[in-house]
Amino acid sequence: EFANLAAGVVVGKIGSATATLNEIIEYESSLNKSTSDEHIKTLDEIIALSTELKARDKKIVFTNGCFDILHAGHVRYLETAKSYGDVLILGLNSDRSVTALKGEGRPINTQLDRAYILAALEAVDYVVIFDEDTPYDLIKAIKPHVLVKGGDYKGKEVVGQDIADELKLVQFVDGKSTTKT
């Protein structure tokens, strides 16, 4: 197995070459790393990334939620959210905040499992977990161009709408909400 890893490093080089132990270890690590991991960011990382994206004239879309029991309605919602800009950043409620919002016994899936699944979706570019009761501070830090929420927010005050340039409300898919379960 070690020889195969070393061969994997060497074939990527030009001409006759050798592989150092560090190169082999790094190569093995890259084989075991999921691309989803690269899309889950810390607050500091997402702030730096959003600044960089804006400098490249990318339109940033932000949404947030618990996304505890992922279903087709969530996927459609996220696909629609992504269509409003170039990059979709999803603020994911921490386990503590999901319990506070939905009650004991929730979340069903841990914050890391939820983040991993969401980051694997084509529509979601980045996931950042937040522990506050609302995403206001996160939205303030990112300063998205577009803030997206579900259609159930129609006629209601949306946290962070004073920060984003634009607010979009997306209708839910009938029969697909797990908010009351």
Describe the role of every protein-language-model region.
Residues 1-26:
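Conserved post-catalytic alpha-helical subdomain immediately downstream of the catalytic base
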Residues 21, 25-181:
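Nucleotidyltransferase catalytic core that binds NTPs
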